[in-house]
Amino acid sequence: MRMNKQIVVTDWIKEKPKLGSFLKLTLSSDERRILRGKRLTDCDQEIILQLPREGKLNDGDILSTNKSNFYVEIVAKKENLIEISSNSKIELIKTAYHLGNRHVELEIEEGILLTKSDYVIKNMLLNFKVNIKNTKKKFFPERGAHSHE
């Protein structure tokens, strides 16, 4: 569904409306931090984000537009990641510590760390007593202590 008129995204909606047209906007974890500027939806419709500067776009967010009954749904993009696991909790904690010292973004799950696929990081991980494997999934890194999101 392409519209010729410019679509401007202006705010978050708390509940998904039962009626209306929806465009899907699939974004990586990095792209979900940028709240202003032009984007292309999944159906190649150009939209302009003009959201309040604070916050972050999350998977499943519904955004209002300057068109009545027209909405944008945020979808987290599947990304190439490294999945890190270990039978030893202490080894996993040490690995998280060293990755944190390198300011590497991490998603922390029960018994698993996830980070973006990176050749240098992958080689560094080979020196730790952890299991590593490539995976592709949605990435939700922890927000840092000094984050302004």
From Swiss-Prot:
It is found in: Cytoplasm. CDD domains: UreE. GO terms for molecular function: nickel cation binding; unfolded protein binding. GO terms for biological process: protein folding; protein-containing complex assembly; urea metabolic process. The keyword Ligase does not apply. Keywords: Chaperone, Cytoplasm, Nickel, Nickel insertion. The keyword Cytoplasm applies. GO terms for cellular component: cytoplasm. It comes from the Bacteria. Belongs to the UreE family. Involved in urease metallocenter assembly. Binds nickel. Probably functions as a nickel donor during metallocenter assembly. This is Urease accessory protein UreE. The lineage of its organism: Bacteria, Bacillati, Cyanobacteriota, Cyanophyceae, Synechococcales. The gene is ureE.
